[in-house]
Amino acid sequence: LALVALSLPAFAQDQTPTTLKGVLLEQLRTTHNQKDWFVPANTAVEGLTSQQASWKDGSGNHSIGQLTNHLIFWNLQSLAKFKGEQPAKFSGNNDETFNSFDAKQWNASVQQLDSVLTEWEKVVEAADDAKLQAWASTIAHIGAHNAYHVGQIIYIRKQQGWWDPEKGVK
């Protein structure tokens, strides 16, 4: 135990200092398109048909398409606020963020999810430290929210036999 304790300071000195920007970017990227601790959003929705994206279990749970649209909505809302823009009108009914899914627009939804997640990475990369300090909690929650719903998407895919385990985290 003493040997481990003595080696920690040396190990810590070899590490590049972590910055807030670095942590936030890592979280955004690993919930978008870089596999790390969990499957990212792009992998989760990759290769699904509109019919698969529309499937619901009949118990009130959301479809993959609905989950995707919910992610798009909340990422766009927060992104607009971060950029100082007016976010889309919102009635306050969170159910509406799920129920707007249109199966005919599935491929466009997949592209829009990728686009908004890419834009988040760009604006965080360009932001100064003061802006990131003010927004750190919100951005961290966005990453956690994205990971939560991506987990639901993976669960549905596994449940329905639409998941390739080779795409998972090893």
Named regions from a protein language model:
Residues 19, 48, 62, 101-104, ...:
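Short coil/turn linker and secondary-structure boundary residues
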Residues 97-132, 137-140:
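Acidic/histidine-rich alpha-helical segments that form the ligand environment
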Residues 42, 46-50, 118-125:
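Amphipathic, well-packed alpha-helical segments that form the structural scaffold of globular domains
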Residues 25-38, 42-45, 52-95, 130-170:
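Short, contiguous alpha-helical
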Residues 15-25:
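N-terminal pre-domain segments of enzymes
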Residues 1-16:
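Bacterial Sec-dependent N-terminal signal peptides
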